[in-house]
């Protein structure tokens, strides 16, 4: 640049990113010369920049704000396959950590230190171990990668135009230490069904701007044959002051059966309730959802007691979840197709 050598490399290893920082003066035209040979794929040269006043503008914005909305997370440039990045926590598109990039952690810490209320909006395509944010942010909204009208949806949710009712479709672990090695195909400790620890957020977790109360759990039958379906019914009441949806979740446990999951989602139903309203809700549980895969890999229905939990999330966790428990008896046995 301007006849000054900025950097060079004779390596064909495109998995490594090389950076060089320069200060550019306003009003000066710079000549740029790039010479390269591309023997493989994924090579890239690009110029990125930030304005010197951005840090000052950021401090002024924090000072003037009543509430801070921090939009943080990941991006397509970080999440993917065989990507030429070498950033801490990432390796060629794979992740070596579930934490946020450290620069974003530092940003969030500085925002909270301002003393202003901080709301975190997450943009990501996979789980994040946002342990510090969980303890220090006033609220956290998981937006994923929401698309063209995502900003409108996020703004309306934060403004209280509607009550969020999404539920996590995967487990948010606290760290990679809670995740079994990828070269171990044993199901022990893997996914919400076999995990014995306490994650950051459980599969099926989600909060609302109101609260719900469950009562009077019943089943359409108390003894279930090997070919029978099952249905669970209960009353759900909105005991808060805002109309909202509740996602009623049904989890099953097969106590004493080797290889059976500790818990398994068997059915769910989303219902809308006005403040003070009570609805009788029925959740259908198809016959196949009463089965489990045993240690030999066979999917079967086994005779014995089947424990059932119905509520707004999983039956265990540090966050108390409203719900009910019951049991039915399975009287027959069957081996089902895989």
Predicted regions and their residues:
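C-terminal non-catalytic regions of proteins with extracellular/luminal or membrane-system context
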Residues: 1-338
């Amino acid at each position: 640049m301007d006849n000054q050598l900025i950097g060079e490399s004779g390596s064909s290893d495109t998995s490594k990113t090389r950076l060089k920082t320069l200060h550019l003066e306003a009003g000066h035209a710079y000549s740029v010369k790039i010479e390269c040979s591309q023997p493989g794929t994924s090579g890239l040269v690009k110029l990125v920049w930030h304005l010197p006043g951005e840090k000052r503008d950021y401090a002024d914005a924090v000072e003037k704000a009543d509430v801070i909305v921090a939009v943080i997370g990941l991006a397509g440039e970080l999440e993917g396959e065989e990507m030429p990045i070498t950033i801490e926590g990432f390796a060629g598109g794979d992740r070596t950590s579930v934490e946020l990039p450290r620069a974003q952690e530092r940003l969030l810490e500085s925002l909270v230190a301002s003393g202003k209320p901080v709301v975190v909006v997450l943009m990501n395509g996979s789980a994040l171990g946002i342990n510090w944010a969980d303890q220090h942010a006033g609220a956290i909204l998981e937006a994923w990668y929401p698309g063209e009208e995502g900003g409108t949806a996020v703004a309306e949710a934060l403004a209280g135009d509607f009550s969020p009712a999404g539920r996590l479709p995967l487990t948010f672990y606290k760290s990679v230490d809670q995740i079994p090695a990828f070269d171990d195909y044993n199901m022990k400790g893997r996914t919400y069904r076999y995990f014995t620890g306490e994650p950051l957020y459980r599969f099926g977790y989600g909060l609302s701007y109101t609260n719900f109360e469950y009562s009077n759990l019943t089943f359409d039958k108390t003894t279930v044959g090997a070919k029978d379906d099952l249905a669970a019914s209960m009353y759900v009441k909105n005991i808060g002051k805002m109309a909202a949806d509740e996602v009623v979740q049904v989890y099953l446990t097969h106590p004493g059966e080797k290889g059976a999951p500790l818990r398994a989602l068997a059915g769910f139903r989303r219902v809308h309730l006005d403040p003070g309203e009570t609805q009788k809700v029925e959740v259908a549980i198809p016959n196949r959802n009463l089965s489990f895969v045993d240690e030999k890999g066979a999917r079967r229905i086994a005779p014995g007691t089947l424990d059932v939990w119905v509520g707004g999330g999983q039956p265990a966790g540090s966050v108390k979840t409203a719900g009910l428990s019951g049991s039915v008896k399975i009287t027959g046995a069957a081996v089902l197709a895989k």
